[in-house]
Amino acid sequence: MIQLSAAQQRAYMSDYLTNGWREERMSFSSVSLEPGYIEAKVNVEHFQMPGDGRFHFSAQSAIIWLSQLGIIYGCWDNQLAAKAGEVYLRDLDLKFKRTINTTQEVRFEGIFPKYCKKQLADGLVYYKNAHFRVESGAFTGTASFLVPIGAAQ
């Protein structure tokens, strides 16, 4: 087996994955909910320009914002005024079908069918296989979350 030197490793590595993601600033411009559904728009306020000169919404950033959707929906769905503890992402299956190059109002959707919610005995609610879409299906997938709701109800 060949051992790569630090210089060889750096020559192959992505600037974005090494440091660029740290420069990103994003925020929700809107969040709307109804039973079983959440929609949010994300604005990209700052990013490192990739080598090809065109912004690409990354898989890493999508995971962060999809996680935020799960947290917000789980808290809202259980009538919590604030997050009661750490929400845990248990499963994640995402497909990246096409690139997202827009930086304004990137649309995220979460669908939480009634059958996906299960109350656990120890003050947790489990959402299994919630469905997610980003930018009309550019990214799609499912995720499962454990949401603490405080003392068992």
Predicted stretch roles:
Residues 36-38, 90, 104-108, 124-128, ...:
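Residues at beta-strand starts and edge strands
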Residues 40-42, 94, 110, 132, ...:
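Preference for bulky hydrophobic residues occupying beta-strand positions
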Residues 55-75:
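Short, well-ordered alpha-helical segments
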Residues 72-116, 142:
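Hydrophobic beta-strand-centered segment that forms part of the acyl-chain substrate-binding groove
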